[in-house]
Design a protein with these regions (language model features):
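N-terminal Rossmann NAD(P)H-binding glycine-rich loop of SDR-like oxidoreductase domains
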Residues: 2-22
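SDR active-site strand-loop-helix element
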Residues: 5, 30, 73-77, 112-118, ...
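A short helix->loop->beta-strand "cap" motif at the edges of active sites that frequently abuts
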Residues: 24, 108-110
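Glycine-rich phosphate-binding loop and adjoining beta1-alpha1-beta2 segment
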Residues: 29-57
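NAD(P)H-binding glycine-rich loop region in Rossmannoid oxidoreductase-like domains
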Residues: 44, 53-54, 58-93
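Catalytic helix-loop patch of NAD(P)-dependent Rossmann-fold dehydrogenases
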Residues: 92, 96-100, 107, 120-165, ...
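NAD(P)-dependent short-chain dehydrogenase/reductase
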Residues: 126, 150-229, 256-258
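C-terminal substrate-binding subdomain of Rossmann-fold SDR/epimerase-dehydratase oxidoreductases
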Residues: 194-323
């Protein structure tokens, strides 16, 4: 059996779908469906069971899985809202919960692959290499992720099974509808074009011209590919960047969406006051450690990925069961 926490979420549901494509349906989905929307991500997936995240936590604390053959745990479940400022809540959900799942996997020698975040690099002024010298946190979400990364580094020497943390950069692609304002810029711009025939980007700030802030945007299929590559190849434990290593400006993103949809123009809006001092104007993964681990499967070209994503959205926007 394979366990995917956050399996009804964006990246988790994509991992499940790819596992299905590879013939695996013996999957336990762990999530919380209370928002009434993310259940839609499950309709096109094949899995043997579902468990609420609180019940799953109780199960691992009670050792209810003793004797169950678990091949891997993909821990994608988290609160990823960068505008959530309840630090106690963030630490409970993203740090304490993750520690419980980690120690369960260590105890039973189950590969543990988890979602970290490029937000742990703060402003990025020290670079984007995995390690304390580059890391910082601009918001509670980033702090909760950074705290867990640091905890993992402490326990790695005593681990007898694989532990892999992947610092996701800006992920985009199918099955992110439910994320609302936290969905990728690609999804936001797709909807803007549908409604107004325009895409609205931030004006310049901190020395950047209008729309010229740059991020490392990574297609969700590539994120899934990196996860499964580490697991299937029993690659070395550690914390790795999961980004393309090449940044693109928001102007490039806006134009890619316009080109994919065949219509539209770009306009600029004032940079929000609430984000000043808390916003990453530039991100770009340093891929050295990922490549050193042996990963050689590459990443999608952004324009091609955007066209594929737009076509997916135009054709219903959710995975189909059995396809």
């Amino acid at each position: 059996m394979i366990i995917v926490t956050g399996g009804a979420g964006f990246i988790g549901s994509n991992i499940v779908k790819e596992l299905n494509r590879r013939g695996r349906t013996d999957i336990l989905i762990v999530d919380d469906l209370k928002d009434g929307q993310n259940y839609k991500n499950l309709r096109g997936l094949q899995f043997i069971d579902y468990q609420h995240k609180d019940d799953f936590l109780q199960s691992i604390e009670n050792d209810d899985f003793d004797g169950t053959d678990i091949d891997a745990v993909f821990h994608e479940g988290a609160c990823s809202d960068t505008m959530e400022y309840d630090v106690n809540f963030m630490m409970r959900v993203n740090y304490e919960y993750s520690k419980s799942v980690l120690h369960f996997c260590m105890q039973h020698r189950v590969p543990f692959l988890y979602a970290s975040s490029a937000s742990t690099y703060g402003s990025g002024k020290h670079g984007f290499r995995e390690g304390d010298e580059c890391e910082d946190a601009l918001n509670p979400y980033a702090f909760s992720k950074l705290a867990f990364d640091r905890y993992v580094r402490q326990v790695l020497p005593e681990a007898h099974s694989q532990i892999v943390g992947l610092k996701y950069f800006n992920v985009y692609g199918p099955q992110e509808h439910h994320k609302g304002k936290m969905a990728s810029i690609f999804y936001q711009l797709y909807n803007q074009l549908k409604e107004t025939n325009k895409v609205r980007l931030f004006k310049g700030i901190d020395g950047y011209k209008d729309g010229e802030q740059r991020r490392d945007f990574v297609y969700v299929k590539d994120v899934v590919g990196v996860n499964l590559w580490f697991w299937e190849n029993q690659a070395p434990s550690g914390i790795y960047n999961c980004g393309t290593g090449k940044s693109h400006s928001y102007n490039e993103v806006g134009q890619a969406v316009i080109d994919a949809m065949g219509t539209g123009s770009i306009e600029y809006r004032e940079f929000p006051e609430v984000l000043k001092g808390k916003y990453q104007n530039f991100t770009e993964a340093d891929p050295a450690n990922l490549l050193a681990a042996g990963y050689d499967e590459g990443f999608h070209d952004m324009k091609a990925a955007v066209k594929e994503y737009v076509d997916f959205l135009d054709n219903g926007g959710y995975f189909e069961y059995g396809k």
